[in-house]
Amino acid sequence: MARTPIDITLPDMTGSRAVVTGASDGIGRHIATRLAAAGAEVVLPVRNPDKGRTALAAIEAAVPDAQVSLRTMDLSSLESVAALGATLRAEGVPVGILILNAGVMTPPERQTTVDGHELQFGTNHLGHVALVGQLHPLLVAGRARVVSQVSVAANQGAVHYEDLDWERSYDGMKAYSSSKIAFGLFGLELDRRSKAAGWGITSNLSHPGIAPTALLAARPEVGRSRDTLGRRLIRVMSARGILVGTVETAGLPALLAATDPAADGGRFFGPSGPRNLGGAPAEQPLYGRLADREQAARIWDLSLRLTGMTGLGTPAAGRDIEAAS
């Protein structure tokens, strides 16, 4: 079956700095490439320098005049996130777009971050919360558009408040869903807090549907070294245009959330095909689990406490964050 071409047109982004996490490969690299092609100056925080250099070369090959550079950051280490924040604040360039795309998915065995949190909760959620806190002065200065990349998994399960780090009984898929629900709730609360305080930050959510990405591929570093029938099936379906998306189309919802003037905060974008697994990007109703404002406020307070970003949103936020780093 021939796949119908799917794309969106990005506005001219010359003069705007964009920061994209998880851009070493897959969806994140495609997002970064499109932003660079639109004229943005793109910063790629990467954990693996070799993969980062490969991504940089690929983006520069696709966009010869790209303004793109690497920085070092490991989302599973709050100290590493703080170091990146200090570096970017020292550079003093306002951030106009922040796309929080990086993630880790379903390690078969429980693993922890440098700071002792369950790997998915600590990386997918807390690491990104800390990054928002560290970059807050630059986000305000750039009247930034922040996009939190969640998942169809945020439509199942719940935040595991009674055991956030899954120390008693680990279930990889449930832990993944919990991390993505928490992350989505925080992204929506960020928009509400910004509007209330006049920060000028616009925060939306997106999800990529399903596509053959590194998140689904063999990941020896999280204990997944074998390919599986399910992953092979997704690759075949993607290549034939059946139900799921491609790496390129899966990045479009985040790009739409980041650049569409109608995406004015608190909105949710994803693929519009059957079961929202593939297809053209479009706004979608919030998953019920993400629409609970009381839970969002709870996650906000809890997340800032766990990341040491409790000064976020106060008049002294910039000084508090500087001191924390």
Regions found by a protein language model. Give the residues of each.
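Rossmann-fold NAD(P)H-dependent dehydrogenase/reductase core
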Residues: 1-223, 306-318
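Short, contiguous pre-domain boundary segments
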Residues: 1-5, 278-289
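Short, contiguous strand/loop micro-motifs
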Residues: 18-19, 240-241, 286-287
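A short, hydrophobic secondary-structure junction motif
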Residues: 21-23, 76, 123-124, 245-246, ...
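Pocket-edge positions in alpha/beta enzyme catalytic cores
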Residues: 44, 73, 242, 288-291
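A short C-terminal helix-loop "cap" of Rossmann-like NAD(P)-dependent dehydrogenase/epimerase domains
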Residues: 167, 223-238
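C-terminal helical subdomain
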Residues: 179, 231-283, 293-297, 301, ...
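Short, intrinsically disordered terminal tails adjacent to the first/last structured region
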Residues: 322-325
